[in-house]
């Protein structure tokens, strides 16, 4: 890649480099919006080469995208003063009693603000300390290649020598350029002398000799230029190819070793890592190392070669002139440093607010149902907008500094032109130099200086690689305490399966101050089934982890058949154990492949495929999985999707059980294997577990005590010790014991009622309810007639209409509007900056016209060297120097307005787009969010990424594009004016010259993007394994994963090898051809000068205005990716903004209800429904439910029967395909949506709290503005929710920060705050969607009391898996396959002995 002395090349390169770096950050950070913010990428522009430019580099292009700071997430630290209490909450009553009421919640605002400020300072200091502690020193440059083979090292050294040779070509070219200039000047002098003295035979002979000499010199020098071009082509092709291939090989080895090292680490290693850190290392850091060890290393040496050769040549030719010209370097460095510091300051501050906005967006979009249920889209949208507005204000300030810094820096560059001609004129007039030497030295210094600037971004890539490698190598070199790669250890020939713990003490390495096991001693006899029960944190799962040897005890010993497990070979130990966890991880392969993973390390590992399949099939039959597997589209060869996402929870569990038992292990560990399942799925899975545990040592952990009643022995754990043990019946005999208390918390009454309810009529076939309303006799008749004619129900027809509309929407998304239409709309959207855009456009055009205009000045300056009188020569060049100085001042002014104007407008547009996109996103209905493309991750990623990409084009980049176009057009016009014929030749060569920029884009700029895409599949595989490291370790899949990963890396490597030969050849050809074209123009120009068609001044004017302007204009291709990304991003943003959801909470249409007159009578009539994303699944089928005002109704049934869908229908998250939902007899579709939802409150299974105070989160439920809610109303809601005493016991009371997603509170505390939020609006209807299912028994009891209190006097509809919480309901509806199978009171349904009765029996713990 060639260095260019031109600032236009420099600045354009800066834009593309900034874009590239922005994209790296956005790609690596956008699926995570809450990480520490790094320093903003800004500062001194680093010019990038596009072609060997030797003309006058005059036009600057504004700095790149400093203002377009990428999205990065800011992690939110916990508030120090309250975190201890929140994480380790003592008894709430004891806390409450310890705080006198007179002092509770009476803190002054001053004290609160003071304490908040102090906390923020402490938080900042802690973050700085953590950051310092986590920083590793970068590895040495040579360490980057420590895995390279000797032959590769030889090839790389040879490539570096070629890179240095390629870098030397441009300074050598200036030498040729200087010699040609001298020849032209000498010829012009002779012509002038002859013209002054008249034509005589002697002068005619002298003139002919001068012509012959010029023709000969021009021919020779043109050949030299072509030779340099050919040499540049060969050297560039070879070194780019060599370093590209060796970089890929080196990266492949590092990736393989890093993943191998990760998989061999003990589990404690992962406890200290962030959730996505391993994935980030694999996807991002390995890419950074590859980028910094491939051709960028060679480019560093090329630019260094250019710098050294240029300065050496300059000082050899004229030490005095060279010494004067190097004065520009410190000025450029100082100005760039100041600008970098200022931009980093403003950029980091802007990033802080953008990151906070991104974090808020993730929370809000991740809980969109809660947001819409409470109608708080506007409040949360305003909070988001506040952060964006603050970032915009800071970005505007930074824009001024950016423009000012660039204008000063480029003024210094242009002033150097004036110095060159002024001082050069003095030297020539004194006979110390000639025109060729002045041009040679000037261009050599300029090329050398810019090569140093261009070296910086490539050197930055190497520096980043060193930093990234430090993290990778730290893991690669780390020897874990528990090493799965260690082949040592005993492998006994036989195993009985007896496990014993002897005085085991343990704490997690990440929490050394929290003891988990305290002298734990017990024995699990071989072949028996044991159960561990107890409260959360009592040490149950830790026991399983110690048996798997995920951790080693701090003291004591764990033995297997009397041997310390630390003496056993680790892989052998884990291969004897089958583990099924609460959330089993399946890998992205087939059902068969997942089960076969359980055969690794067994005697069947290398069995034939047929034999393996028989084992897999048997294991699946034992696990009750064979039946559903055979119903899958491809049976055992069906892909299960990422993490088994295409299977239900129960299906995943059964496949995991089959995987655990397929190798017939002697030990089976079941860590809450059924707790996440509904009762029906739990029953099926529990049967599979009971069958699988026969003849094995089985240890089960369960919250649902019904699953372990048949265990041989049950251990009740508390505070890391066994506090009670025995069989189920033995433990129940101790009525006051801890186990009996746990049972009582889940106990159901067993008294049966005398009479049973009549079964509901089967209404399976009544699908013809008329769409959208109650069924009148005429409508029913019409519906039946329609079915008779078409054979299809109205619900089915409605679903077809929805599907057709979705297909139309998807087709429309593939159509991107014209660029003109998009850009016009974007400019209209940012119309507030209309004047700024106008001034910036004018400034960019003026900056673009500077280059061709000064081509005239350059040509005239060179013609001045023809003057023979020293004084006159010096005066003429001094005048040209003055004009250069004036040009420098003018250019500095237009550069300031261009850079500052476009940068500011870019920030403003970014802010407008973010706010409008976020507001439009929240306006969409739930159906929109259900689509995979609109998942929380995808939407938050788009919110972070898309406005950024539009800003990337409509900020400084837009100015650069306008400037480049102005340069090209202006150059052609001036060239045609000064020399039409030569201009036409130059214009004919424009496609070739401009293509250099395009080829550079394809080869260099897009190369990194292409390689990232090629590595996406292998990176996903590695991330999947790293994200399921416990599963990988328990299955001893480490070697298997390494093998698959290595195979996956071969594809990108082979493809890169094949494409590199062609692409690098094209790139090298574009560099070499430029020299050849310049040689052609020079030679033709010399011939026409000899023929008298052109003067020297005209020739150089045409040469600079067209040829070199075309080269620089080729830089516009650098921004093709920006334009493409901006177009697609803008189109996507406008689609989101323009989309009108069918259920629009912002709509002002519909009847308004008076809250005081709402009774709360809810009725669902003949509702049919299918989710649009799953049109083949009928969810609700003619569902009819009547809930009288003020009653408590419960919905129960197996998973997938339609209970939660019913709640969502009541919230009007969806509309039924047929039938209707009414409130007080009015179809809810006729009501104003926002007003309707204000009558309802929802408490879900996983309550969402937002970053902010407890007060803020409670007030989100209010129906009136927050400032109008009184403290008494807040207190009353909190007392009803059983959370008031806890809140006022906190140091900051209601002003305590809850952390992101309520992270500073326990599950029970979050749930009760959510209940208070639901109650503060005094709802007429309360919806409870499994509000206690995720809690342990103790928390469930407290929350259930709050719910019972909250339900009094309100229409309440509750869903619960734990039937103990709803047995006193006024009416219980038992769902089956989307319809009501039976309903009645608890006692009435028990008497029926139907589906509800079966559920009760499965959870009945007190039956003997």
UniProtKB/Swiss-Prot annotation:
Residues 1-103 are annotated as: Disordered. InterPro entries: AAA+_ATPase, ABC1_TM_dom, ABC1_TM_sf, ABC_transporter-like_ATP-bd, ABC_transporter-like_CS, P-loop_NTPase, Type_1_exporter. Pfam families: ABC_membrane, ABC_tran. GO terms for molecular function: ABC-type oligopeptide transporter activity; ATP binding; ATP hydrolysis activity. CDD domains: ABC_6TM_Pgp_ABCB1_D1_like, ABC_6TM_Pgp_ABCB1_D2_like, ABC_MTABC3_MDL1_MDL2. GO terms for cellular component: mitochondrial inner membrane; plasma membrane. Induction: Expression is not induced in the presence of fluconazole (FLC). SMART domains: AAA (SM00382). The keyword Repeat applies. Residues 17-38 have a biased composition (Basic and acidic residues). Keywords: ATP-binding, Cell membrane, Glycoprotein, Membrane, Nucleotide-binding, Repeat, Transmembrane, Transmembrane helix, Transport. Residues 1-13 have a biased composition (Low complexity). It comes from the Eukaryota. Its main location: membrane. ATP binds at residues 534-541, 1197-1204. It catalyses: itraconazole(in) + ATP + H2O = itraconazole(out) + ADP + phosphate + H(+); voriconazole(in) + ATP + H2O = voriconazole(out) + ADP + phosphate + H(+); fluconazole(in) + ATP + H2O = fluconazole(out) + ADP + phosphate + H(+). It is found in: Cell membrane. Glycans are attached at residues 244, 934, 1127, 1182, 1404. Pleiotropic ABC efflux transporter that confers resistance to structurally and functionally unrelated compounds including azoles such as fluconazole (FLC), itraconazole (ITC), posaconazole (POS), nocodazole and voriconazole (VRC). Belongs to the ABC transporter superfamily. ABCB family. Multidrug resistance exporter (TC 3.A.1.201) subfamily. This is ABC multidrug transporter MDR1.
């Amino acid at each position: 890649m060639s260095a260019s002395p031109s600032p236009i090349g420099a600045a354009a390169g800066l834009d593309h480099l900034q874009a590239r770096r922005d994209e790296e950050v956005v790609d690596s950070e956008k699926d995570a919006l809450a990480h520490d913010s790094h320093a903003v990428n800004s500062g001194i522009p680093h010019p990038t080469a596009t072609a060997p430019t030797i003309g006058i580099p005059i036009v600057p292009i504004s700095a790149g995208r400093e203002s377009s700071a990428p999205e990065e997430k800011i992690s939110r630290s916990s508030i120090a003063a309250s975190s201890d209490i929140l994480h380790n909450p003592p008894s709430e009553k004891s806390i409450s009693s310890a705080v006198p009421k007179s002092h509770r919640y009476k803190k002054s605002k001053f004290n609160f603000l003071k304490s908040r400020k102090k906390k923020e300072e402490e938080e900042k200091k802690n973050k700085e300390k953590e950051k310092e502690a986590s920083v590793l020193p970068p590895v040495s440059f040579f360490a980057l290649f420590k895995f390279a083979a000797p032959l590769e090292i030889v090839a790389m050294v040879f490539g570096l020598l070629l890179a240095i040779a390629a870098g030397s070509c441009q300074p050598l070219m200036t030498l040729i350029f200087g010699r040609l200039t001298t020849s032209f000047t000498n010829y012009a002098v002779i012509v002038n002398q002859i013209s002054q003295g008249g034509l005589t035979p002697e002068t005619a002979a002298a003139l002919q000799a001068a012509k012959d000499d010029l023709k000969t010199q021009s021919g020779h020098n043109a050949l030299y230029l072509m030779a340099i071009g050919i040499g540049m082509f060969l050297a560039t092709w070879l070194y780019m190819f060599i370093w590209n291939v060796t970089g890929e090989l080196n990266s492949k080895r590092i990736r393989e070793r890093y993943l191998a090292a990760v998989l061999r680490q003990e589990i404690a290693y992962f406890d200290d890592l962030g959730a996505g850190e391993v994935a980030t290392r694999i996807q991002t850091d390995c890419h950074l190392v590859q980028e910094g060890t491939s051709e960028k290393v060679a480019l560093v040496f090329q630019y260094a070669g250019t710098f050294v050769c240029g300065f050496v040549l300059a000082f050899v030719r004229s030490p005095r002139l060279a010494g004067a010209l190097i004065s520009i370097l410190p000025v450029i460095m100082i100005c760039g440093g100041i600008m970098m510091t200022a931009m980093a300051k403003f950029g980091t501050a802007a990033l802080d607010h953008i990151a906070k906005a991104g974090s808020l967006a993730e929370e809000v979009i991740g809980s969109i149902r809660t947001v819409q249920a409470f109608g708080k889209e506007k409040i949360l949208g305003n909070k988001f907008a506040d952060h964006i507005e603050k970032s915009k204000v800071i970005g505007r300030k930074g824009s001024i500094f950016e423009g000012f810094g660039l204008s000063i820096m480029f003024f210094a560059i242009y002033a150097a032109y004036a110095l060159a001609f002024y001082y050069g004129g003095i030297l020539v007039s004194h006979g110390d130099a000639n025109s060729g030497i002045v041009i040679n030295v000037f261009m050599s210094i300029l090329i050398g200086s810019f090569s140093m600037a261009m070296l910086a971004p490539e050197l930055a890539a190497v520096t980043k690689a060193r930093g990234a490698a430090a993290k990778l190598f730290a893991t690669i070199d780390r020897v874990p305490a528990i090493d799965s790669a260690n082949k040592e250890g005993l492998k006994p020939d036989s195993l009985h399966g007896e496990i014993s713990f002897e005085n085991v003490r343990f704490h997690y390495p990440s929490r050394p101050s929290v003891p988990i096991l305290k002298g734990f001693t017990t024995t699990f006899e071989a072949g028996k089934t044991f159960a561990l029960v107890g409260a959360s944190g009592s040490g149950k799962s830790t026991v399983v982890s110690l048996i798997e040897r995920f951790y080693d005890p701090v003291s004591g010993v764990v033995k297997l058949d009397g041997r310390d497990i630390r003496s056993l070979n680790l892989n052998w130990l884990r291969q004897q154990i089958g583990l099924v966890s609460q959330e089993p991880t399946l890998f992205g392969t087939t059902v068969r492949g997942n089960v076969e993973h359980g055969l690794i390390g067994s005697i069947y590992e290398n069995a034939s495929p047929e034999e393996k399949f028989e084992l897999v099939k048997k294991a699946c039959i034992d696990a009750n999985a064979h039946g559903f597997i055979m119903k899958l589209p491809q049976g055992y060869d069906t892909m299960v999707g990422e993490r088994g996402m295409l299977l239900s929870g129960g299906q995943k569990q059964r496949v995991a059980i089959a995987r655990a038992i397929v190798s017939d292990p002697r030990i089976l560990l079941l860590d809450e294997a059924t707790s996440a399942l509904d009762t029906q799925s739990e029953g099926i899975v529990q049967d599979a577990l009971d069958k699988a545990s026969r003849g094995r040592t089985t240890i089960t952990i369960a919250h649902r005590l019904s699953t372990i009643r048949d265990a041989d022995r049950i251990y009740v754990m508390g505070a890391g010790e066994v506090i009670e043990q025995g069989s189920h019946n033995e433990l129940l005999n101790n009525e006051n014991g801890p186990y009996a208390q746990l049972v009582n918390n889940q106990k159901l009454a067993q008294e049966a009622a005398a009479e049973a309810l009549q079964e509901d009529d089967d209404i399976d076939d009544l699908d013809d309810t008329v769409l959208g309303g109650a069924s009148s006799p005429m409508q029913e008749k019409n519906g039946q007639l329609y079915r008779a004619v078409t054979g299809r129900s109205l619900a089915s027809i409605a679903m077809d209409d929805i599907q057709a509309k979705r297909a139309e929407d998807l087709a429309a998304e593939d159509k991107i509007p014209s660029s003109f239409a998009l850009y016009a709309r974007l400019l209209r959207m940012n119309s507030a900056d209309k004047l700024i855009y106008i001034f910036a456009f004018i400034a960019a055009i003026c900056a673009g016209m500077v280059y061709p205009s000064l081509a005239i000045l350059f040509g005239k300056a060179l013609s001045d060297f023809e003057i023979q009188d020293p004084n006159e020569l010096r005066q003429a060049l001094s005048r040209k120097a003055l004009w250069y100085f004036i040009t420098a001042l003018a250019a500095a002014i237009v550069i300031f307005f261009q850079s500052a104007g476009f940068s500011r407008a870019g920030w403003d547009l970014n802010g407008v787009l973010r706010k409008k996109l976020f507001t439009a996103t929240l306006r969409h209905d739930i159906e929109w969010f259900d689509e995979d493309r609109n998942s929380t991750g995808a939407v938050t990623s788009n919110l972070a990424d898309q406005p950024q990409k539009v800003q990337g084009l409509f900020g400084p980049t837009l100015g650069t594009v306008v400037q480049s176009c102005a340069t090209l057009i202006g150059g052609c016009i001036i060239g045609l004016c000064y020399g039409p014929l030569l201009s036409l030749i130059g214009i004919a060569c424009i496609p070739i010259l401009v293509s250099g920029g395009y080829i550079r884009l394809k080869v260099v700029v897009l190369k990194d993007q292409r390689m990232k895409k090629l590595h996406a599949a292998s990176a996903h595989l590695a991330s999947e394994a790293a994200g399921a490291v416990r599963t990988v370790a328990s299955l001893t899949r480490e070697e298997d994963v390494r093998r698959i990963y290595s195979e996956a890396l071969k594809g990108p490597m082979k493809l890169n090898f094949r494409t590199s030969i062609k692409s690098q050849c094209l790139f090298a050809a574009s560099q070499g051809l430029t020299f050849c074209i310049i040689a052609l123009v020079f030679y033709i120009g010399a011939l026409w000068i000899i023929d008298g068609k052109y003067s020297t001044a005209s020739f150089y004017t045409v040469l600079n205005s067209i040829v070199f302007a075309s080269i620089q204009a080729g830089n516009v291709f650098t921004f093709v990716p920006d334009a493409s990304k901006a177009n697609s991003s803008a189109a996507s943003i406008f689609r989101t903004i323009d989309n009108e959801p069918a259920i629009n909470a912002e709509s002002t249409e519909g009847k308004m209800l008076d809250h005081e007159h709402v009774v709360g009578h809810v009725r669902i009539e003949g509702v049919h429904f299918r989710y649009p994303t799953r049109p083949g699944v009928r969810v609700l089928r003619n569902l009819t439910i009547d809930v009288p005002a003020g009653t408590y109704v419960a919905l129960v049934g197996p998973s997938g029967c339609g209970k939660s869908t019913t709640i969502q229908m009541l919230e009007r998250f969806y509309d039924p395909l047929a039938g209707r939902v009414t409130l007080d007899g009015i179809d809810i579709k006729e009501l104003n949506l926002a007003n309707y939802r204000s009558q309802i409150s929802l408490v879900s299974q996983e309550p969402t709290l937002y970053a902010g105070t407890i007060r803020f989160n409670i007030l989100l439920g209010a129906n009136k503005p927050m400032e109008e809610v009184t403290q008494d109303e807040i207190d009353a809601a909190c007392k009803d929710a059983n959370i008031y005493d806890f809140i006022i016991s906190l140091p900051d009371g209601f002003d305590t920060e809850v952390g992101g997603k309520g992270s500073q509170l326990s599950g029970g505390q979050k749930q009760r705050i959510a209940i208070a939020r639901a109650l503060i609006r005094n709802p007429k209807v309360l919806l409870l969607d499994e509000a206690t299912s995720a809690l342990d028994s103790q928390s469930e009891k407290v929350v259930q009391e709050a719910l019972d209190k909250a339900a009094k006097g309100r229409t309440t509809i509750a869903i619960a898996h734990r039937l103990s919480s709803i047995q006193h309901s006024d009416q219980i509806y038992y769902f089956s396959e989307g319809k009501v199978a039976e309903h009645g009171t608890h006692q009435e349904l028990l008497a029926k002995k139907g589906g509800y009765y079966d559920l009760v029996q499965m959870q009945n713990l007190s039956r003997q």
